[in-house]
Amino acid sequence: MTDQENNNNISSNPFAALFGSLADAKQFAAIQKEQLKQQSDELPASPDDSDNSVSESLDEFDYSVAEISRSFRSQQEICEQLNINHMIQRIFLITLDNSDPSLKSGNGIPSRCVYLEEMAVELEDQDWLDMSNVEQALFARLLLQDPGNHLINMTSSTTLNLSADRDAGERHIFCYLYSCFQRAKEEITKVPENLLPFAVQCRNLTVSNTRTVLLTPEIYVDQNIHEQLVDLMLEAIQGAHFEDVTEFLEEVIEALILDEEVRTFPEVMIPVFDILLGRIKDLELCQILLYAYLDILLYFTRQKDMAKVFVEYIQPKDPTNGQMYQKTLLGVILSISCLLKTPGVVENHGYFLNPSRSSPQEIKVQEANIHQFMAQFHEKIYQMLKNLLQLSPETKHCILSWLGNCLHANAGRTKIWANQMPEIFFQMYASDAFFLNLGAALLKLCQPFCKPRSSRLLTFNPTYCALKELNDEERKIKNVHMRGLDKETCLIPAVQEPKFPQNYNLVTENLALTEYTLYLGFHRLHDQMVKINQNLHRLQVAWRDAQQSSSPAADNLREQFERLMTIYLSTKTAMTEPQMLQNCLNLQVSMAVLLVQLAIGNEGSQPIELTFPLPDGYSSLAYVPEFFADNLGDFLIFLRRFADDILETSADSLEHVLHFITIFTGSIERMKNPHLRAKLAEVLEAVMPHLDQTPNPLVSSVFHRKRVFCNFQYAPQLAEALIKVFVDIEFTGDPHQFEQKFNYRRPMYPILRYMWGTDTYRESIKDLADYASKNLEAMNPPLFLRFLNLLMNDAIFLLDEAIQYLSKIKIQQIEKDRGEWDSLTPEARREKEAGLQMFGQLARFHNIMSNETIGTLAFLTSEIKSLFVHPFLAERIISMLNYFLQHLVGPKMGALKVKDFSEFDFKPQQLVSDICTIYLNLGDEENFCATVPKDGRSYSPTLFAQTVRVLKKINKPGNMIMAFSNLAERIKSLADLQQQEEETYADACDEFLDPIMSTLMCDPVVLPSSRVTVDRSTIARHLLSDQTDPFNRSPLTMDQIRPNTELKEKIQRWLAERKQQKEQLE
């Protein structure tokens, strides 16, 4: 029978309709033939069988209706077998049948399959796949080095189908198995119920074979299995079908966990992390690809088994070497930033190159673009950490240990030498970018309890910071992973060992980790920013000078300026991402609340109201490291300098900061370190409204801050705290205290000026002055009296120093203009230039400070008079004012006429105006006017006449000039009278003269230990600065001195006699 007849017979068979196609029916018949052949071979020959029509028809391919009907008893099984074959072909895209495609139907058959020739030969006549050989077939497919060379058409279609070729000929076996898994999933949803177990079995085969591939990757030639896994995940993220891939991976991971005989699960997965490490380390912050890789890691940190491998994988080889943490996978991620990778090297840096050629708007756009990436980047890192903390106690312990060990190994970043030796620094410690990013992520973890009224916030237990070294098991039990905090200096010394709880909550640990990270990172970078800013200013001045003088160094200076500006803009951008700043402000405001609650002895979880006077019970502060408060202050100062708008938009939170400043600035019992307390004055300056704010109609600028500051409930206590710290920093015990105190007091002057302009603060200051006036001879000098004494000390020293520096600058400028420097060697000339620059910087500093001190005295004397005119202070302030007038309006003023007053912040007109204002404020007091002529060193009627002339020259108001002229006349009259009296008393014996001042004593007193008699006003002035006997250094207070009544009476009798003698002579 011909093929055509055979086909016709089958097509006319009514049972053929049960098959999907004519080819299927033919295949069924072939199977029947094979089975019958096998049966006939096994049975002995029989005459009856020789005429068997079925056998004959099979031999002759004669498929009659009767013959097919007789074999239908196995039709259902055979049909199922054919369907299994097709299903296997659809799932795995493999086949054993390479017959003519035209004889195959396209119904249910893939258009392209890989023909497994060797297996087909091995199975001889079987050209179908079933559940008994599918595993072997799949394995054979996986071993093919180039499956694309084995593709065959399964249908007669001639249409080019590239996707079918790609899918069937997929060379990467991991991707191939994943695709098989997806096709098996689809089959499960479509196949009849009787085929469902086989579809599930095929799906399981993809998983088990993927497990095998990962366990024994070496047997698959030219296949980088782990690369393929990463690429598959990467493609899934970019193609938005990541959940499908993770479903597949979950099953593979489960299979690997159950079979660790060949390789452990970590051994299998570590190469994946190696690949991620190698790829991520070369990526930049603003590359989209980076975020796809981070999403892969986010999945790994959510998957419990992968997360365990991850936390083990990131452990550094040497946990004591801080820099090693940066080389781990997590460390590499944390090191990605817009900061320079190699400090000082701007070549190949991708941000803010040639900034002078960019407009401010272009720079702002680039900054905003970087900030968008930073916000996304920090969110990814935060989610990774959060996943690990929440996944299991094991991963939580591991990641917290990593963080704690990392911070401890990098503790040296805060040492002074570290900043002075950068080449060693970067070999020993992780980078600034590392800690900036880690800080940003940890800040996000803290946000749930970073609310001022959060009950969780007050569950922080400061004794955590006092714990000594623990072993790993103890750390796990107690939830303590930070190391070395017990060696940190705390706010106050501890009196006794604290009572430690059995364990600590995550709030405590998070706060400690975050604050220390900010201290190592943000705090240090802020210092860098300030130095860069200063260097930029110096370079700008030098560049401008070089351009004006046509110096060949101009180009070099410009290049230096460009490079430094790139560093500055990169650093500023890295530190000012808005969400990070807001999160940090939330934390620091919460820290202010926490420290205030600890300072008033609150050990509960609910905040209590602040009241004055402060209650006792603040021992918990003995376990709070100073860097908690230092971070708070440092961050607010940073905002004032580089992101002031954040302060204004969060003004309502600043009341909590004012509470903190009020308590700690004025309380040495709660904050022992005078330097830290002095820094709080700078913090106060940072959060208060700007004095020199330029109005901006689009922004409320300082409105909100002004409202908070002016309506502050504890204004009197804040004013007193400020004055107290002004006094306290005079004696810090530091060998450099003399130089330091001026820097510490710099921000205090504008604060005092602002306070004086606000009614509540001004009245508080006046109350302090009134108290001082009534207690001048108290055992301890009143606070405000000591403040005024130090203020005058500063004014005298600062303006005197400024005058000296200006005189030196004047001389050097004359020498330079005359050409005297031209003949010098280049080195000698450089030294001269450097000396002139140094004098200029010193003169500028002293001028700024003296302007502030004299200005402060000018506004204080407008309403506070009694203290200034008291003998304790009057002589000193008068001698100071006259001395300065002598230099500013007298013949000596020519020595101060440098080329450019503004370059050195020298404001002689303002100084003269302020000094005259002080005179006019106090001139109504007769005693004060009478004391002016007693200044024999500087006072003369001519001096005041010269002052009037200068006031006219600088166009001061006429009423001021007239008032000062009248005052000068009154003082001159009193001077004439005093001169006559001095002539009368000129021959006073030494017994009547003050041994210190050599003036006639008015109120002699005896010092208890040295038994020396001095004038009361003299010793009172001395004790304001030094509470010791000036003759033997024994401790001394005003209440210990005794009046020398007998000597006083003798002096008064002698004066009366001299006066009587004079009258008789007249």
Swiss-Prot record:
| A Gene Ontology cellular-component term | ubiquitin ligase complex
User: Which residues are recorded as modified (N6-acetyllysine)?
Assistant: K386
Record-listed E.C. numbers? 2.3.2.27
Q: What class of enzyme is it?
A: transferase
GO terms, biological process = ERAD pathway; protein polyubiquitination; ubiquitin-dependent protein catabolic process
SMART domains for this protein? Ubox
Predominant localisation class:
cytoplasm
Q: Which InterPro entries match?
A: Ub_conjug_fac_E4_core, UBE4, Ubox_domain, Znf_RING/FYVE/PHD
What is catalysed by this protein? Answer: S-ubiquitinyl-[E2 ubiquitin-conjugating enzyme]-L-cysteine + [acceptor protein]-L-lysine = [E2 ubiquitin-conjugating enzyme]-L-cysteine + N(6)-ubiquitinyl-[acceptor protein]-L-lysine
Q: In which pathway does it act?
A: Protein modification; protein ubiquitination
Q: Which UniProt keywords apply?
A: Acetylation, Cytoplasm, Disease variant, Intellectual disability, Transferase, Ubl conjugation pathway
Q: Localized where?
A: Cytoplasm
Query: Region (Disordered): which ranges?
Result: 33-56
List GO molecular-function terms, semicolon-separated: ubiquitin-ubiquitin ligase activity
* Pfam families, A to Z: U-box, Ufd2P_core
User: Is the keyword Magnesium in the record?
Assistant: no
**Keyword Transferase attributed:** yes
Q: What does this protein do?
A: Ubiquitin-protein ligase that probably functions as an E3 ligase in conjunction with specific E1 and E2 ligases. May also function as an E4 ligase mediating the assembly of polyubiquitin chains on substrates ubiquitinated by another E3 ubiquitin ligase. Mediates 'Lys-48'-linked polyubiquitination of substrates.
> What family is this protein classified in?
Belongs to the ubiquitin conjugation factor E4 family.
Instruction: Tell me what disease the record lists for it.
Output: Neurodevelopmental disorder with hypotonia and gross motor and speech delay: An autosomal recessive disorder characterized by severe global developmental delay apparent from infancy, axial hypotonia, limited or absent ability to walk, impaired intellectual development, and poor or absent speech. Additional features may include seizures, behavioral problems, distal skeletal anomalies, and facial dysmorphism.
About its domains, the entry says: The U-box domain is required for the ubiquitin protein ligase activity.
Write down the PANTHER family for this protein, in alphabetical order. Answer: UBIQUITIN CONJUGATION FACTOR E4 A, UBIQUITINATION FACTOR E4
The entry's protein name is Ubiquitin conjugation factor E4 A
Q: List the source organism.
A: Homo sapiens
Lineage of source species: Eukaryota, Metazoa, Chordata, Craniata, Vertebrata
